[in-house]
A protein has these predicted regions:
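Soluble catalytic regions of large protease machineries
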Residues: 2-149
Length: 149
């Protein structure tokens, strides 16, 4: 993900942190390092990269993979919304939304074996939900504070 400047990067990472929290993924988070350009600023525990375990049923394994996929989608969308907070005005998201969808659609097919309708529905629900979340003044305040530190 390319950022325009340091402020843009800070808001983007703040958005991803909020996305992780919304999807209750704090237990999967290892660290956030604003200076770690090489590894994408956010590191996860090995459990995030879970790819199956013979001791876990296939259904449980699929649900874990789906949860991580949904959280990743949420992080990307939250990044988008949070990066637009400093502008303080409504933003058109159509182009960015298409680009994110294209990326996550391929991943959803590959990792979760979801079909196009399932991916589209989940993506739109996530987008709509996060749009509401980032309209909340309390969330916006948290995002501003996180991005400033």
């Amino acid at each position: 993900m390319k950022y325009n400047d340091e402020e843009d990067k800070c808001y983007g990472i703040a958005g991803m942190a909020i996305g992780i929290s919304i999807w209750n993924g704090e237990d999967l988070l290892y660290q956030i390092d604003i200076d770690d350009d090489e590894h994408g600023y956010i590191s996860f525990t090995p459990d995030y990269y879970f790819s199956g375990n013979p001791a876990v049923s296939p259904v449980e394994s699929w649900h874990a993979t789906l949860k991580h996929y949904q959280m990743t989608v949420g992080m990307l969308i939250a990044n988008l919304f949070c990066r637009n907070l400093p502008a303080g005005k409504p933003t058109q998201y159509a182009d960015a939304k298409k680009a994110i969808f294209s990326t996550v659609a391929d991943e959803g097919k590959r990792t979760c074996q979801l079909d196009d309708d399932e991916i589209r529905s989940m993506f739109q629900e996530t987008f709509n939900y996060l749009e509401q979340v980032f309209r909340n003044p309390s969330v916006r305040k948290i995002a501003h504070e996180f991005a400033q530190h």
